[in-house]
Regions:
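Generic beta-strand hydrophobic packing signal
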Residues: 12, 176, 441-443
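Short, solvent-exposed coil/turn segments
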Residues: 7-9, 97, 131, 190, ...
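Non-catalytic accessory/interaction domains
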Residues: 48, 73-76, 81, 140, ...
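Short, flexible, glycine/charge-rich loop motifs used to bind or transfer phosphoryl groups or to couple energy/partner
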Residues: 2-4, 167-169, 185, 430-431
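Acidic/His-enriched low-complexity segments
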Residues: 12-174, 200, 303-307, 320-325, ...
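Short, small-residue-biased leader/transition segments that mark boundaries at the very start
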Residues: 1-3, 7-14
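Short alpha-helical hairpin
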Residues: 48, 127-133, 195-196, 282-288, ...
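Hydrophobic alpha-helical and helix-loop surface patches within well-folded domains
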Residues: 104, 136-398, 533-538, 549-550, ...
């Protein structure tokens, strides 16, 4: 828009009207930005203002439904690059030698949390496709990682083109630049024109696993989808922040499909979202997808697995209710209606209601506005399959959804569609055959259902048998989730789960299923500790004999994590010392760094030498600084570890949040559990300050790093004592603690 006419303010104020003129007014303010959200390092800085930190950089009404046009001028060292939401319009030298003044073009309408700039010693790469340019800025020094930039740019182009085709709306902003930063707090952040990404997920090791490649592709697709869902159309208030995250993750899963034609994407969707959602939804700290938000200062606490992972599962249900064509029409109308503006979930539902006879508001009330999930059981009675749901929280809720079961009785088998209605607790259907003896009931065989599919120890044997023999990858993924959830709900035993998984894992050839099973096996050992030697033996055999090299690498990483026996630790020490990995198990620098931390804790007499040696091996200056920050947390000297912990209670020492989280996790490593129980109370006491000074994911990362390795009664007592001492502790912070402490109960 044209510049506003400048109004001359009187030197003395006689009334409020003296300060305003008829028509548009302009206010000019001189201010000094606070440092909190400038993320300063020695050679670069960047803004990160989501959800309510713009006010720490410049005076503003800091809420998402007040959008503005931004212009920016930066003065920086002449050796630095700068990038912002708008394109550079002019670069001038200043009167101060060695400094430049860089001016940027005015932006489209943006919410304050999307305002962004980055400045520093950065390398720039430029890529073009069909008349569109993308710049990638980074600080990487490894030529093999820098060589990945063309592939990164290609995936950005692919995601932009996919969304343009689906939405029918050309990319709604002037440019799309990528900045890849070391130590960045999140996977990515969707600032228009200046999208930030973490180097940990963008620059992959020389031999990345399928999981790592899919993760990068999904991240790029997620942040790119935000350009339409979050930036172009923004939530009115942060209680609806999930409405941008649900679309970003749901569409990310679809955008990556053509990039990986050999991947089972139905299985990948299940694997990506359902386990992560259950990890919070099963706990006493569960929250609804849409949460009440009293004040924007608490907006960061709305974020979590429920809005990132449960919501795309629910969105997929909604798409099935509407049908693909109706869904696409509704989404296009939604984007057109609220272009460059703000919307609510209720507004979207009103639009989608035009395309279906279903009562979407009633459906949404249960799935979106209520926390938790149904407990679902199944049995065969009088020749019928009987499926029942109940609300474990006693509210009498009924979750409408379509499920698919399979009943196997001897040589007879039948697949049965199950419809749980919003007004019914049960479903019954006559089997097409006469049951003879015990039947195996396989729940949720296509993975499209959501809930706790409860089984007994006796019933689990049938599921394990099918898991070992079936060739249906989606069925196997769903069974793995069901079995693990029953382990966590303590309806089946850790010993039985561990034994069955050790028998199953070496024979699984599908990489997605292998990674799921490996993760679940590691969790079982972490939460229900037992003699590690049987697990070590199976894992090392996979490391040395498995025909799939990425399976060897993934097994090695779990082996490193759980190794306890003298034989295993010595084997790892020799491997680290000689830098000689097993055949077809290529280890990266980050693998050796992780190994050095683990060895320093297992071998206290060699710890100082291990750390010094590993530090000398690291060449990249950013990674060297990270190692110097984290390595004191694995010191063999308790007084040094106590000093590290005390330092983390000071906000300034937590500024690089991934480093702080890693240090806290090492302080609370299972090998230090007895001594680190003393850290629990003060770290929990610090949670309000951690939230106030940290970014949106940091409170969860903080408490996860603190508690995840603890399994003792003493640790549980510390958590209980904390809540007893703080009966009025803020609900949203309490939920974060309860979600990460659930394994203690």
């Amino acid at each position: 828009p044209p510049p506003h006419p400048k109004h001359s303010f009187p030197t003395r104020r006689s009334s409020d009207l003296d300060w305003v003129a008829v028509g548009e007014n302009r206010v000019a303010i001189t201010f000094t930005p606070a440092d909190q959200s400038l993320n300063r390092r020695d050679e670069f800085l960047y803004t990160l203002l989501v959800p309510d930190r713009a006010r720490t950089v410049f005076p503003c009404f800091d809420q998402p439904d007040m959008k503005s046009f931004f212009t920016l001028t930066l003065e920086v060292p002449s050796t630095w690059q700068a990038v912002a939401n708008g394109a550079i319009t002019q670069t001038d030298s200043t009167s101060v030698s060695g400094r430049n003044r860089i001016s940027f073009k005015e932006t489209e309408p943006l919410s304050t949390y999307l305002f962004s700039f980055v400045a520093g010693k950065l390398t720039r790469e430029v890529y073009s496709r069909n008349g569109r340019d993308i710049s990638i800025y980074h600080r990487e020094t490894d030529p093999k990682k820098i060589a990945q930039c063309p592939a990164i740019a290609d995936e950005v182009f692919d995601a932009l083109e996919w969304q343009e085709d689906f939405t029918g709306i050309p990319y709604p902003f002037a440019k799309y630049d990528v900045i890849i930063l070391p130590g960045f707090q999140y996977g990515g952040m969707e600032h228009t024109g200046a999208t930030l990404y973490t180097d940990r997920r963008m620059f992959l090791d020389e031999h990345p696993t399928l999981n790592e490649r899919l993760s990068r592709s999904s991240l790029i697709a997620h942040e790119t989808s935000h350009m339409w869902f979050g930036d172009y159309v923004t939530m009115k208030w942060f209680d609806d922040v999930w409405t941008k995250e649900v679309f970003a993750n749901y569409f990310a899963s679809r955008i990556v499909e053509p990039l990986y034609p050999d991947v089972n994407h139905r299985l990948n969707f299940i694997r990506d979202y359902i386990p992560a959602s259950y990890s919070e939804d099963r706990t006493s700290g569960a929250n609804p997808i849409k949460q009440d938000l009293d004040n924007l200062r608490n907006a960061g606490l709305v974020y979590g697995n429920i809005i990132y992972d449960k919501s795309p599962v629910i969105m997929e249900m909604l798409v099935r209710v509407l049908g693909e064509d109706a869904f696409q029409q509704g989404i296009r109308e939604y984007l057109t209606t609220y272009a460059y503006g703000n919307a609510t979930w209720e507004g979207l539902i009103r639009i989608l209601n035009k395309y279906t006879e279903e009562d979407l508001a009633a459906w949404s009330e249960v799935w979106v506005n209520q926390k938790g999930m149904p407990e679902i059981t199944a049995s065969v009675k009088d020749g019928e399959l009987v499926v029942e749901q109940r609300d474990p929280l006693g509210r009498g809720l009924k979750w409408p959804q379509e499920l698919t079961y399979r009943v196997i009785c001897g040589t007879d088998s039948e697949e049965i569609p199950v419809s749980l209605e919003g007004n019914s607790d049960s479903f019954r259907m006559k089997l097409s055959f006469l049951p003879n003896g015990n039947c195996v009931i396989l729940p949720n065989i296509n993975g499209r259902g959501y809930g706790f599919f409860k089984i007994t120890e006796g019933e689990s044997s049938g599921l394990w048998s099918v898991l070992r023999s079936s060739e249906d990858e989606v069925l196997k993924g769903s069974l793995l989730i069901t079995l693990y959830e029953n382990l966590r709900w303590k309806t089946i035993s850790p010993q039985g789960f561990r034994e069955e998984m050790l028998a199953y894992l070496p024979n699984e050839s599908n990489s997605l299923l292998f990674s799921m099973a490996l993760s679940y096996l590691g969790d079982c050992q972490r939460i229900f500790p037992s003699d590690s030697r049987p697990l070590e033996q199976v894992l090392w055999k996979i490391v040395t004999t498995n025909p799939v090299s990425q399976h060897r690498l993934q097994a090695f990483r779990l082996y490193r994590s759980i190794a306890d026996s003298e034989e295993a630790v010595q084997r790892l020490y020799t491997l680290w010392q000689e830098r000689k990995a097993p055949k077809d198990c290529t280890l990266s620098e980050s693998d050796y760094i992780g190994l050095s931390y683990m060895l320093a804790m297992h071998l206290p007499e060699k710890a100082d030498k291990i750390i010094a040696t590993q530090l000398s091996r690291i060449q990249n200056p950013d990674r060297k600084k990270e190692y110097q920050f984290i390595s004191p947390s694995v010191s063999p000297r308790k007084e040094e570890r106590d000093s590290v912990f005390a330092s983390l209670l000071i906000a300034g020492n937590r500024r690089v949040e991934p480093w702080a989280s890693s240090a806290l996790a090492h302080l609370n490593h299972r090998l230090r559990e007895q001594e680190s129980v003393a850290y629990i109370r003060p770290a929990l006491e610090a949670m309000p300050e951690v939230q106030r000074t940290g970014d949106i994911f940091f409170p969860t990362a903080w408490v996860r790093s603190l508690l995840s390795a603890h399994t003792s009664k003493e640790a549980r007592k510390e958590v209980d004592a904390f809540f007893t001492a703080h009966p009025d502790f803020p609900l949203m912070l309490s939920n974060k603690i309860k979600q990460q402490a659930s394994h203690l109960y």
